[in-house]
Amino acid sequence: IYKEVVYFDIKGQEKFKISEINDKKLDLSQKNNTYIKAESYFEDIKSLKEGEIYVSDVIGAYVGSKIIGTFTKEKTKKSSLAFRPELHGYAGKENPLGKRFEAIVRFITPVFSQGKKVGYISLALDHRHIMEYTDTVNPVKEHKQDIADASVGNYAFMWNFEGQNISHPRDYFIVGYNENTGEKVPGWVSADVQKQYQESKSKSLHEFLKTYPKFEEQSLTKKPNLKQLKQKGELGLDCRYLNFAPQCQGWMQVTENGGYGSFIIYWSKVWKLTTAATIPYYTGKYKNTKRGFGFVTIGANVDEFHSAANKTKMKIEEV
């Protein structure tokens, strides 16, 4: 379940460690020594009281793809790419040879001795176990599946409470970090946002988005920024800036006060029933939002979803 179990002292120095990530004992007060240089928990955990738990975001290196959907020789040829599926993000049946998104969720709690804080216990949950909740689900089939197939439009995926994707059959849609810098890789944006970014002279899209309005006039009339796909293959889904996907705003509204809800959308030339349900986990920073850890969304082709009822209707009409 865990990629790492560590005890470190109040200065951040690891004392006892079992790890699949790095078996060297490190000084965790230095961000460069944390997982893919992306964790900044050391200052946050200083205020933890006895029994309290720090819970991180999903932390993992982004895996991109310059091909969306089934990875074929025809598509790579059209995009002037070599047919090397292993160099692009994993996508279930669409690209079973692709690079997997690997990540952790870190849990930290303080250790006290005679009323004095002396160190911390840290557990790094393997994100694979979170993905198994959604990758094994097909909303139009009764049994769990071994491998997801997003091409048919029937699948489940997961978002954090802010609307960033943390689990998807297409791993390249999961928001992640640059493993060399520890900086979050910006999500896929609409073409109009890309234009404003270029006009802003900001040093990076990541910096530009820090001050850009969230969920700005999301509409199907807006188009995706194809430069991100063709040039960088950076397609992480961050609902806050995915302005060509208005269902994002719908999911956020449905889950705003916790609970769940459904609506129908027209997406990729198919009518789909989409359902969003919050994840009631309220430990650490997740106690501050009614969405808890985030929410799961399930999308199903409307015709397939109602296929059993439609067949019954046809039989009745034949009588």
Where are these regions (language model features)?
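Extracytoplasmic/periplasmic sensory segments of membrane signal-transduction proteins
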Residues: 1-80, 131-164, 171
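Conserved beta-strands of PAS-like sensory domains
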Residues: 17-19, 69-89, 97-140, 167-170, ...
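Solvent-exposed, extracytoplasmic
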Residues: 31, 35-36, 41-44, 90-97, ...
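A short beta-strand signature of PAS-family and PAS-like sensory folds
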Residues: 57-60, 65, 91-92, 263-266
